[in-house]
Structure formats: C-alpha cells, structure tokens
C-alpha cells in the first residue's frame, strides 16, 4: 500500500487473516508502555537486542530478525495485541516445521493459518511505516568491535534504567501543541491516528529546519547554502 494512503486508513491488510491496526493517539496514550513494547518485539533487529541476547549467551551477529521474533513470541502472544492485530488472536499459534523447506513457522492448528518469516517481514514493515522506524542491518567488523558495541549499549541501558520513565509520547504532544507550525490542540491530537501524528511530527521538524536554514541564509550565517 502506498504510504500516502495510510493517512486515512485504520489498518494495513497483510493477508486474508491479518491486518496491522493504526490506533489513535489516545488509544496509544492509554496503553503506551505495552503498545511500544509490542511494536519493539515485532520490529526488532538483532542489533537492537544485542545486550539482552548476550545475557542469554546468543551472539547477535549469528541470528536473523525472524529467529529473534521467535524468541519473543511466547511472551508476545500472552499480551493483549488488539491495538496491533485487532481481533486476530496469537494465542493458538505454536512453532512447527514447514515440511516443504524445513524452516520454523508458527501455525494455528485449528484454522491452518501460518505465520512465516516472509509474513513477519510484512508485519514488521507495516509497523515501521506507521512509526517511521528504520531497519538497522549493521554488523560489527570483528569480535572486538562487537564487544565494544555491546558494552557501550549496556552502559546506556544502565543509565536509562536509573532515570524515572516519563511518557515520551505525552512530552512530544505537549511540545507540538505549543509549536506554531502544529495546528491541533490536545483533544484534537488524541483523535489523530498514530500515523497521522508521526507524519505531523516529521513535517513540523522539516518545516522548522527549513525556516532555520533560511533565516541563517538571510542573516548571513549559513553561507554554505548559497555557494
């Protein structure tokens, strides 16, 4: 589906059984921690979870995103996933082997519905579109670089854990509502889809960046832009 169509959609169809929901800002606010945690489980790349994988003895450079998702799946399927999948229920799905190629898949034996690596990729891609997430395929050049990356991320997570967690979405809403380029109030923002809101954030940032550059040009402080 072309990205422009998402502005007015409530969901993104994946196949005949699965659709990825596009909730409102208000719905996300009421379930912020669990919602973004599930989005992370569905879109995470091994590099995003390098510390967690290292803690259980897995080298993040040796697995792919599908294998990572399978590690999360039992935890994910026990949660309320309605903001992501609507009435599609993950609980009946169990790991199985595809007899055609020997790959691990997830199967609902009662309905025959399957989730494989390709389908998971489509689901993750839809969520990345909704939230403007980049797919991080980076890998360290060698073992020493890998250890350095893990240790640096471990320190970052430790510092983050020492701070009181605030609602990042709420802070972003307050910032935008008090920006002249944004034309919604608090209640109006709650009714926007999370995709509409994320698009608004991106456009406001672009507009402010453009205005600042133009101001610099005319003030004579950004001569590189006119050379």
Short names for language-model regions:
Residues 226:
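Conserved small/polar residues in nucleotide/adenosyl-binding loops
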Residues 74-162, 166:
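Hydrophobic, aromatic-lined core segments that form the binding pocket/scaffold
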Residues 59-81:
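Extended, charge-biased low-complexity segments
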Residues 1-63, 122, 128-216:
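An amphipathic, hydrophobic-aromatic interaction surface with interspersed Lys/Arg
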């Amino acid at each position: 589906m072309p990205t422009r169509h998402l502005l007015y959609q409530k969901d993104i169809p994946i196949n005949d059984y699965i659709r990825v929901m596009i909730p409102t800002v208000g719905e996300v606010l009421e379930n912020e921690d669990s919602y973004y945690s599930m989005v992370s489980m569905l879109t995470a790349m091994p590099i995003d979870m390098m510390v967690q994988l290292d803690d259980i003895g897995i080298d993040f450079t040796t697995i792919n995103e599908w294998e990572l998702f399978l590690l999360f799946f039992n935890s994910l399927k026990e949660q309320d996933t309605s903001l992501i999948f609507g009435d599609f229920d993950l609980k009946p799905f169990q790991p199985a082997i595809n007899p055609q190629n020997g790959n691990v898949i997830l199967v609902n034996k009662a309905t025959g519905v399957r989730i494989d690596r390709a389908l998971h990729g489509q689901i993750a891609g839809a969520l990345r579109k909704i939230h403007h997430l980049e797919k991080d395929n980076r890998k360290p050049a060698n073992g020493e670089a890998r250890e350095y990356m893990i240790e640096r991320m471990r320190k970052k997570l430790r510092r983050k854990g020492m701070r009181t967690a605030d609602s990042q979405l709420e802070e972003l809403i307050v910032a935008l509502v008090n920006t002249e380029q944004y034309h919604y109030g608090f209640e109006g923002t709650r009714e926007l889809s999370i995709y509409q809101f994320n698009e608004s954030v991106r456009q406001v940032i672009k507009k402010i960046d453009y205005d600042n550059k133009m101001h610099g040009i005319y003030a004579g402080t950004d001569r590189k832009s006119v050379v």
